[in-house]
Amino acid sequence: MHPPLAALLALAALFNVSSGLANCFQDAGERYRIDPLLLYAIAQVESGLNPRARHDNRDGSRDIGLMQINSRHLPALAAFGIAERNLQEEPCTSVMAGAWILARFVQRLGYGWQAVGAYNAGTASERDARRERYAQQVWAYYAKLLERRRAGALRSGTRP
């Protein structure tokens, strides 16, 4: 079997999602050098894997789609032709946008849990505790996915 195809099928089996959606995580991970399992864990924590999820925040902003992209990112995403509707209706666009946002935090903070926490809570010092809680939530799910990867669950097709 061709290695990229094998990887895609394994990813789809682990995620228990269509190969198309698994491919979205794989493509975004490759493009931004982020483990696709980490992106999947973020989507699980953010939206419960609901591509139509929407959350209105107390500060007036909105979190949109599978990766719960905050509306404060919409002006920057508009430069790429991405609008709120795209994030709500196109799960792959949401995954790619989420990976881009996380990659920007990685550039600023390094590839670590501070960047993951900043994905949800930003970088303001008064949000340290919120960043840490969020990173712990993502880590808990990510660790389970890593364990399944190590245990060979990629081949079994079991749900993460």
Language-model region placement:
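Positively charged n-region of N-terminal signal peptides that target proteins for export
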Residues: 1-6
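Catalytic glycan-binding domains that act on GlcNAc-containing polysaccharides
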Residues: 15-160
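Bacterial N-terminal signal peptides
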Residues: 7-16
